[in-house]
Amino acid sequence: MPDRVLRSSKERLLSGMKGKLFLGALLLGASLVGASTTETDTVKGLADDPVLIQLDSLLFADYFLAGPDSTVEDPTVIGAGPEVSDSVIQYRLALLDEQTPLELDYNEHVARFINVYANNRRQQVSRMMGLGQLYFPLFEEVLDKYNMPLELKYLAIVESALNPRAKSRVGATGLWQFMYSTGKIYGLEVSSYVDERSDPMASTDAAARFMMKLYESFGDWNLVLAAYNSGPGNVSKAIRRSGGKRTYWEIRPWLPRETRGYVPAFIAANYIMNYAEEHEIYAQEVSVSRYDVDTIVLKRLMTFDQLSLLVQVPVGDLELLNPQYKLNIVPIIKGKSYTVTLPREKVGLFVTHEDSLYRYAEAAMPGLTLP
């Protein structure tokens, strides 16, 4: 069970922790994450950071239910979050650190990203909380299968802002941002019609196997995160250049620029997903949850438009639940079977009337073939 036994650095008692934390707060400077920090101060130098780019792309996703604003104040207003002292932030993060084999350290780099989440990107955090209700149960199931720290589920926040169809400037795709070649190595199908890098189940399983392989090489979860982002070669090179240091913070100066912000963003994501409501950020609901869905195997080629008409599920919901179908078409290919995820109550409807639904679809669009 990798890292299940807490290292000696984590065998400290919570009693007596407060004094150390307040001393650390004085060293860092009070209220690093208070509302007094402006967006210009916080995101200066982060404008082209992939984490912020993915966060901002979530504003254009249409997966969310209409309704009252999910934050107490206008999330677009800089400093809309309540002011929270640095010592409180540090103490909360230390409590989370006690509950995981990951090292959730706190410093000015982590504080910078916490401020981004808590003050400058509140609406995006609200949306990620909603998507988390759909994806986190799935992530936890897969991580538990491989006996990995469950907190690694928050890595998808840094990678894709939980947008299943996210695509980076260099072509990394999906919740876990697999490049084409890496996806193929881990068995993900990428074709003109199907991209399993965007399949929540398939890509999560592949990401877990990839991280376990990295853990076998580095034996440290923070180094695994760095290697997931920059590649194991860059981490090994940073270890050599640092004189053989073996922790993320020791080798950080020798890592690529993007990776120097990657682990701090991950630690900040752990914080904000556990303490969002203390910052008056609440989940913006999506139309479905992981516990309310099931899968079927189609026996006939069908478009999302057809399926939407037949089972009365909005196309947007079908896209959210089945992001692996690139053209919104579920293909039929000899020797392969493709599943469709639907709201659970619609699965029963489909199974009960399956043959008549196929006949209706054929009558409506006879001879439909792949484009």
Features from the language model and the residues they span:
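LysM (lysin motif) carbohydrate-binding repeats in extracellular/periplasmic proteins that recognize
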Residues: 303-332, 371
